[in-house]
Amino acid sequence: MTIHIYNTLTRQKEEFMPLEENKVKMYVCGPTVYNYIHIGNARPPMVFDTVRRYLEYKGYDVQYVSNFTDVDDKLIKAANELGEDVPTIADRFVEAYFEDVTALGCKHATVHPRVTENMDIIIEFIQELVNKGYAYESEGDVYFKTKEFEGYGKLSHQPIADLRHGARIEVGEKKQDPLDFALWKAAKEGEIFWESPWGKGRPGWHIECSAMARKYLGDTIDIHAGGQDLAFPHHENEIAQSEALTGKTFARYWMHNGYININNEKMSKSLGNFILVHDIIKQYDPQLIRFFMLSVHYRHPINFSEDLLQSTNNGLERIKTAYGNLKHRMESSTDLTDHNEKWLAEMEKFQVAFEEAMDDDFNTANAITELYNVANHANQYLLEEHTSKVVIEAYVKQLETLFSILGLELAQEELLDEEIEALIQKRIEARQNRDFALSDQIRDDLKGRNIILEDTAQGTRWKRG
């Protein structure tokens, strides 16, 4: 099976063919570290971590680079407001970022370059653009000369005339064309700065990613990814800078994830409806947040609400309960061989369907449907009077493998005594209401969590298995 990726550049799905056989060079734009990340910021790390994991599962050696912007207007503003220096704030929120995304199941990148640690190659990149006539200095600032790059607008699919019509020159800017963008910004009084051929200053946002992608991945990379909001102007400008300098294709496949809405309203700081990751993971299991995010195709918007999160949790718990029941049954299973082929063949179908979903532009929503199918099928098998250890082990391994590809874990936290008592009371009420289906489900769910119930004349007793 071949992987196909929706390429923003061509607006169609294309067969994925990396430059080097079995190797993938992948760059994902990272955060500006001036504050804690919100769930919108967390979607790209989760999405593209999953892409990376699947590529690795398929046998690719993935070189995954994701940067930190640790000097920027927002950082300077935060430093002034807090009375701290920029490096102190950046260090604090780099650490906070790692805590958040690690909790969400994201692996560290191969390299996490920081702008301040790569200033020499950024300045060198700008100087080369100046030398080639693609950039010019203006009173200490350096701008990219957009009209000199013939392909400008090809990623956002907008004619340059339309882009120029919507652009403007801000107060204090000294550029020749409204579409020109800053490669280097002259330092203002009291700002952090670096020495350069154009005087004291710091780099513009767009040049940072171009320079660091080239340093760590070369002139042409396989996959460049980020949030939908970065397609223009950030990624458009990256293409212009990089291809103007090298004369080569900068990135062959462009991937962009969709936005997140909060209760059907676009999430934004101006509306005050954003949710910080370090807050939400205190309220909900981080694995649930990831499962929820992956239950929607990465290019589609996600509507984030507590009702939807709870509904997703119910589904996740069904899979985990099936897994727990399988693990519990393993000890009592035998070396039975009759009918094994029938169940193992069905498992193979689920595996194929899962991979077909992921091969189709990393469709995690359809892939998760196959997880439910595996769990449901396993539950059917557990109804058999006698079960085979071979089949049980195959179910367990399959669920563990598929969950791992999605960056998820199947382990369930041990229930507290009061949680067990509450579920037993809920079961008693269900039996009183003659809702035997719910009663049996609660019993089976507890069994999957290694809690054994015993109904006696004196009431229900329980013990840990």
Swiss-Prot record:
Task: For the motif 'HIGH' region, give the residue ranges.
Answer: 31-41
Q: Any idea of its EC number?
A: 6.1.1.16
Q: Enumerate the cofactors the protein uses.
A: Zn(2+)
Annotated GO biological processes are: cysteinyl-tRNA aminoacylation
Molecular function via GO: ATP binding; cysteine-tRNA ligase activity; zinc ion binding
Q: Which residues bind ATP?
A: 269
The record places the motif ('KMSKS' region) at: 266-270
Q: Which InterPro entries match?
A: Cys-tRNA-ligase, Cys-tRNA-synt_Ia_DALR, Cys-tRNA/MSH_ligase, Rossmann-like_a/b/a_fold, tRNA-synt_1_cat_dom, tRNAsynth_Ia_anticodon-bd
Cellular localization per UniProt:
Cytoplasm
- The chain residues annotated with the modification Phosphoserine are 270
| Co-factor binding details | Binds 1 zinc ion per subunit.
Per the record, the similarity remark reads:
Belongs to the class-I aminoacyl-tRNA synthetase family.
**Name the UniProt record assigns to this protein:** Cysteine--tRNA ligase
What organism is listed for this UniProt entry? Bacillus mycoides (strain KBAB4)
Q: Which gene encodes it?
A: cysS
